[in-house]
């Protein structure tokens, strides 16, 4: 019988596997707001379901938090956090964003969670971490007023 990594890597290479590699990821808004909770929930789900690879689901807007976005969490697993303060109020502020420091804040928490997950599951379980497209990040850090001015093309097709 193959271990998780052998199964996933064989499938990627198009080689025979003992069974199809399986995984699943989801937002659990009540368990993804700290590195410890995200790691514990990811490891719990892995042990419960025997997933072959993991894609830890970072909290919904954690990357926007790196630039000052403030959120209010419901504590419920199916209710996304509400934005209490946008990182950007309008398009003029876009140029003021600075590169995020991976050693602090939300990004550091995500890296801490990945390290804790790796320590808990060992090297035989592949972990896939992703960063969504920068366009999606921009959409999550600005107010509706910013959306109206930048994201919606005018009838002539130009960006207003």
Briefly describe each language-model feature range:
Residues 1-79, 112:
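N-terminal basic, low-complexity leaders that serve as flexible interaction/assembly modules and, when applicable
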Residues 72-160:
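Active-site-proximal, glycine-rich beta->alpha crossover segments in alpha/beta enzymes
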């Amino acid at each position: 019988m193959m271990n998780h990594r052998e199964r996933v890597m064989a499938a990627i290479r198009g080689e025979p596997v003992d069974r199809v590699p399986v995984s699943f990821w989801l937002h659990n808004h009540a368990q993804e707001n700290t590195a410890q909770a995200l790691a514990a929930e990811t490891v719990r789900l892995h042990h419960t379901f025997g997933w072959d690879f993991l894609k830890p689901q970072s909290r919904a807007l954690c990357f926007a938090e790196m630039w000052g976005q403030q959120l209010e969490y419901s504590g419920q697993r199916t209710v996304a956090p509400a934005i209490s303060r946008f990182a950007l109020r309008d398009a003029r502020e876009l140029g003021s964003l600075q590169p995020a420091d991976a050693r602090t804040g939300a990004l550091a928490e995500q890296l801490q969670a990945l390290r804790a997950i790796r320590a808990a599951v060992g090297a035989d379980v592949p972990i896939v971490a992703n960063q969504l497209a920068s366009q999606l990040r921009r959409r999550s850090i600005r107010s509706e007023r910013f959306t109206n001015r930048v994201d919606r093309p005018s009838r002539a097709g130009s960006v207003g």
